[in-house]
Structure formats: C-alpha cells, structure tokens
Design a protein with these regions (language model features):
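Glycine-enriched, solvent-exposed interface loops adjoining structured elements
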Residues: 1-217
C-alpha cells in the first residue's frame, strides 16, 4: 500500500479525480492527509505499530530513553547473545535494593518502566560496553513520500482512505458535508477495530502496558 494508491481511491470518494474540473486538492495536500491519517491510526491502534528491534543502550546509565519518534517501550526481552531480562517494578527494586543504581555495570538482568514517561525505562545493572538488547516498542512512522510503501497492512487501506476523505472534507469549506465527513471518520474507527471489541494498549495503575478489551457499558 502506497500513499498514491490511497490518494487515488480517496479522490474518487470526494469527487476530486479531475474528470470534470481541476482538482481541489494537490497531491502534496492529499499526501499530508495520508500522513495525518497514519498518525491518527497510531493513536487509535498503537498495537499496529509495534517494532521489534535490537538496540544499543547508553553505556553505564541505568536510565534509558528511546528516540523521539517512539511513543512507548513495550517490552525488553533479553541481552542479544545472552540471557533474558525480567521486568520488575521500580518501587519494589528501590525498596529491596536501594543502591541498585550505583552497582557495577554489566549485562542487564532486570528492567523497569519509568513511572511517568513511556519512552523511558531502567536497566539493572547499567549496561556495560558492547551490550545490545532485544526490545519491542511503538513507533509512529515518519512522513511518507507519495510512492513509499507504508508499513501498515494492506487490509487497513480502506480505513486510511476513509480518514483521508474525512480530513479532506473537513477542510473544504466550500463543499463540506459535516455529517458525511463524520460518517467517514466513524468508518475509519470501525475499520481499525476501534469499537466495543477493540484491543487497546493501555497502562495499568502500576505503569505496565497491557491489552484489554472494551465492554458494552
């Protein structure tokens, strides 16, 4: 699925396919709508944007931070070429081993979520030089060029098209149909599964990311 394919389908739905009159929106404007739609999809269904990667943490630092295009750390699995890294609660670690932040660097055996910043996490012990860790995180894609292949599965194409139509009609003051725009946005949400059966990535009171199902009340 490319932005161009999405734009072509969206133009038909907004009667902007250049068949009878000049296009109301340029390809650049439509591409902007596509990239906005992807970012909205990431907010509604962050689980569709989980990345598995091996990364090099900052040496000799217990507190780590992922890049700015990452919205949250999901899991720290293991040291690459080494053992598993188990998740523990930071408050529990602080109570049971008050000096854990000053211990000698080495291969991490535990990790903890930051209580207030989903992009940050802690490693125990602090990683030594040459350490790589296997992690999962949610990353919002950079803006796509019109011919790029998007990372979202093609089965979600109709959802992105619906959101592009919504965004186009919402800014077209001359011909906007508010109810029609709302219908396309509702279709976008439903196509993503953002209804009563949606599986959301949420935070528990402990700060740990979890998945749960919505209910009818």
């Amino acid at each position: 699925m490319t932005p161009q394919e999405v734009i072509t389908q969206a133009r038909v739905l907004i009667n902007d396919d250049n068949s009878l009159m000049p296009e109301r929106f340029s390809d650049t404007e439509m591409l902007g709508f596509v990239n906005q739609a992807i970012k909205r999809a990431a907010m509604v269904r962050p689980d569709l944007f989980i990345i598995s990667d091996d990364i090099t943490p900052t040496v000799d630092q217990v507190e780590q931070e992922l890049s700015t295009n990452v919205t949250r750390i999901m899991e720290v699995h293991r040291v690459v070429g080494g053992g598993a890294i188990g998740e523990v609660d930071k408050e529990t670690m602080d109570r049971s081993a008050p000096n854990w932040t000053t211990e000698t660097s080495g291969a991490p055996v535990n990790w903890m979520r930051h209580p207030r910043n989903p992009r940050r996490y802690f490693l125990y012990p602090a990683p030594s030089t040459g350490t790589e860790i296997s992690v999962e995180y949610i990353e919002v894609p950079d803006d796509y060029a019109i011919g790029d292949t998007m990372g979202l599965a093609d089965s979600y194409r109709s959802a992105i098209v619906d959101c592009v139509v919504y965004l186009a009609e919402a800014v077209d003051n001359e011909s906007v149909d508010t109810e029609r725009a709302k219908q396309f946005y509702t279709s976008f949400l439903q196509s993503l599964g953002a209804d009563m059966t949606q599986r959301d990535v949420v935070d528990s009171e402990s700060g740990k990311a979890e998945q749960r199902r919505g209910n009818n009340g």
